[in-house]
Amino acid sequence: MRAPSTSANLGSGFDVVAVAHDAYFAEAYVKLTSGCGVDIKFRGFDPGGDNTVRRAFQHLFERLGRCWGVEAEVDNRIPIARGLGSSGASAVAALAAFIREAGLRVDPAAVVEAAGLGEAAAAGSPHFDNVAAAALGGAVVIASVKPLELVKFSPRLTFVVGVPDVPPMPEKTKVMRSVLPREVPFRTYVAQLARVSALVAGFARSDPRLVALGMSDEVVEPARAPHVPAYARVRRYALEAGALAVAISGAGPSMIALVEDRDSGAVRAAVERAYAEEGLRAEVKVASTAEGALKDL
């Protein structure tokens, strides 16, 4: 089973919004064995060892009230520590492969919950936005955490994703959360509500113009931008080349630009040039919204 790369937040949707795209993927193969326990082998990028996937299985087994013997092989093609949901997609792909192999019917929210709790092994705390998008595909809103309530949309959107080749930031999630403001002015709060409303409305209508309005952010992104390599230049060059909006992908350092199809080539070239002028190597891809790992289950 295959799970797509994801980009969380998208500007104003901090911790509640993520989109699945086909820039990269993680794929998993599972064989059931006798006994109880999970044996995991990784190929490609290893997102923090097998703890993420192993814990995801443990949480799912607890939810189902039974333990299985599982041999899982995960082929992760999503660069790690780049804000692209690598660990979450690996866990989702493995759980989806297990569910198919075991012939089970499982509530998608239970899969997302198990994978999100498993991701705490890599991120330090549960994150449901990335794993929800990897599982369900399209664009996902976390409407509630307790109980976990997910809302999926299926917009047709095109992105340019820039992935700089930089050393991973130690304790990235902790650092990028530590810089967030503890208080915001009331007017900023109201403006942020308007933006995230536009973001969700844009998903519902598959309207890039509304999504672009929602990708503007005055709270989280300004605080994180100084910690994202080439942020200002990438953003400026992408917008000048025709991008509708630009945001940090997850906690970075990758960036994601929303584009019209006709402008994707020009924006991709502009982002490549921006990284090069900053002295950075980067992989820049044109991507579209993708289906999730649970689509056939």
From Swiss-Prot:
UniProt binding sites for ATP: 79-89
Main location: cytoplasm
Superkingdom in the source lineage: Archaea
Listed EC numbers: 2.7.1.39
Protein's cellular compartments: Cytoplasm
Reactions accelerated catalytically: L-homoserine + ATP = O-phospho-L-homoserine + ADP + H(+)
Record GO biological process: threonine biosynthetic process
A cellular-component GO term for this protein: cytoplasm
Involved pathway(s): Amino-acid biosynthesis; L-threonine biosynthesis; L-threonine from L-aspartate: step 4/5
Keyword check for Kinase: yes
Keywords linked to the UniProt accession: Amino-acid biosynthesis, ATP-binding, Cytoplasm, Kinase, Nucleotide-binding, Threonine biosynthesis, Transferase
GO function term, MF aspect, one: homoserine kinase activity
SUPFAM superfamilies named among the record's database cross-references: GHMP Kinase, C-terminal domain (SSF55060), Ribosomal protein S5 domain 2-like (SSF54211)
InterPro entries: GHMP_kinase_C_dom, GHMP_kinase_C_sf, GHMP_kinase_N_dom, GHMP_knse_ATP-bd_CS, Homoserine_kinase, Ribosomal_Su5_D2-typ_SF, Ribsml_uS5_D2-typ_fold_subgr
Role: Catalyzes the ATP-dependent phosphorylation of L-homoserine to L-homoserine phosphate.
Similarity comment text for this entry: Belongs to the GHMP kinase family. Homoserine kinase subfamily.
Protein name (record): Homoserine kinase
Organism the protein comes from: Pyrobaculum neutrophilum (strain DSM 2338 / JCM 9278 / NBRC 100436 / V24Sta)
